[in-house]
Amino acid sequence: VRSRAVYTNNIPCGAMRGFGVNQINFAVESCVDELCEMGGFDRWQIRYDNALTPGGMTSTGQVLQSGIGIRKTLEAVKDVFQQSRHAGIACGIKNTGIGNGVPDTGKVKIVIESPERILIHQGWTEMGQGVYTMAVQFFCEVTGLSPEIVEVRVDTAEESESGMTTASRGTSIIGHSVIDAATKLKQDLEQSSLEELTGKVYQGEWTCDWTTALESDSDNIQ
């Protein structure tokens, strides 16, 4: 992997996916493929045999519990991969959130401006990672309303706390906050129409406060 750093006078921007991790992963997976070729191993099988599973421990000491779907994912693509002449395969597991015992909070505000216009105020900077799309999908999934009437707006003046735009936190932190606010709207929609709810504001909030602090002596790092 070769890289070049350039010092410029441009205004710095936030990170957009990975801080270089994607490039390193590409190189590591390529090395795994080369080792398989040299040793006569099956590229799919070596990844399956070494995949993390519930009860396993990561390199940082976290004992995994649920939601580990690497093997199921590999099983789902096995036939397609092995039948394709030109196909690559790679595996990865992604955490979300800052961790280290730091409470991580997200807040949103949903405003019913009219029956044809609903605003979702949130503080997450959209740089192509799909935060706006995710917020609309969560909102519509909960309420059953059309995405055509929903607009997502980033506005820190609206006190929509989000923290840093880092660590792939958008889907979990903002997503849960949208669910919280949208659930309240859904309850009102069972009794009232959007026209009757025009002008109403719904606050949503979600906090991840269960991660392990750096100085903690724990057998299971979260």
Regions found by a protein language model. Give the residues of each.
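Cofactor-centric catalytic regions
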Residues: 1-3, 27, 37-39, 43-119, ...
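Gly-rich Lys/Arg/Thr-decorated short loops/hinges at beta-loop-alpha junctions or inter-strand turns
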Residues: 7-16, 56-58
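Intrinsically disordered, low-complexity segments enriched in polar/charged small residues
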Residues: 7-9, 22, 174
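A short glycine-threonine-serine/GTX helix/turn-capping micro-motif
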Residues: 12-24, 167
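Phosphate-handling active-site elements
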Residues: 143-147
